[in-house]
Amino acid sequence: MNKLSRRQLSIGAGAGLLLAPFVAMLKEGPTRAATTKTAKRLLVFCTMGTKPDSWKPTGISGESISAWSAMTQPLSAIKDSVVLVEGCPAGNPGDGHGSPEGLTGQGNGYYAVNNVQQLAISVDQFVADKLKKAGINRPLSSLVLGADTSGGVTMSYRAGKAVAPIASPSSAFSTAFGAVSSGGGGGTMTGGGTMTTPDAALKRRQSILDLVSSEINTVRGRVGSIEKAKLDAHLDSIRALESKLTASTGGGSTGGGSNPDAIKACAGLAKPSDAAGTHPAIANDLLHMDILVNALACDITRVGVIQFGTDQGLQVDLPNLQGDQHNGFIHSGAGENFKSLIAFEAWLATQYANLITSLKSKPDPDGGGGSLYDSTLVVWARDMGDAVNHDMKDMRFVLAGGAGGYLKQAAGGRYVNAGGGASNRHERVLLNVLEAMGVTDYTGFGDPGFSGKSPLPGIAAT
């Protein structure tokens, strides 16, 4: 493979986003080895709380998992990657609905330093700010996506207020990839999560790949056969995502947050009998996950969030499983021994595992021969610990990804129980996330009065 100088390699700004992993291979100079075990990318998977006794693995020996619960069984497919964490109360363990504490470390209440209020900021937004301050500027500092999120409280926060996720997949695609057709930044979002300048290429059913075909051909002609196959797979995934979006919108309209045809959006997902009226949340969130992975792969952002519903509800329409997660599966589930909740939690675990698999299929945007998985930390976080009883006495996380070698992982999966107690509050796991992303100054994050402000032991590899 021939190395090219930046002058010789004429790639426009927009094309450079799509081709980031392969342009990195061609630029002059060797890839710098990482000096510390840190991740470069963060992907947060946000859901409601769960039922703790149904979530916990059924076979545990020390930190080893020998048998998985029905809820977590799908995670066994990626067991070498995952670390399950529980036994961490929130700072305000009695908080329930509407508390911002899940990703911020601040519950309901007033937090101040020297009589100056410290407004809540979630771990994803704090990381995004720190990366920008460190000079790691990308078209989007973060990308927060999620369907069916307007009827309650979501988990990403900035300046004490919840960050509204982008609900429409086509708006999300325009936000992330609009720069390809414009050659510049990623567009401007309005407060409601829609684009002021939607991606014209998608609207015309024209692939963004066609707009940069000459640059694609330039790169294809310079990489070796192995890299060429990876390039084709990378571009095929973007084209497939475009096809799903144009099919789901019936022409690519980017307005609004609805998708009236969930079967077209995600074939085989919705019930054929009521496809015309089915709720699109699940189908849209699957598209959102595809968009996030591709945005990370193209180095359009370093921080992504997928939010499934809110603290008040998520409409589920899957084969043999329909209803509202909150009022139905959680609060009306005792009569069926929480069968529907267990089934939906297993479905969520499957999607989390699929994210890991998808990251492994993408080349690292920084080059070096690794995968996107190698440089990404994937965090499954929840708004509450015990959703049935509405409390935060025992928060739980799933951590996975190569994360630059930060995580202490095991062949059969690792289980960490912090043991409870105020000193082991869940904010410490959020500090692990910051540490994994190379952030060691926690000023301005979490509870300023927490005396044990350090990452939880046992998460990081030594």
Where are the predicted features?
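Ligand-binding pockets and gating/stacking loops
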Residues: M1-T462
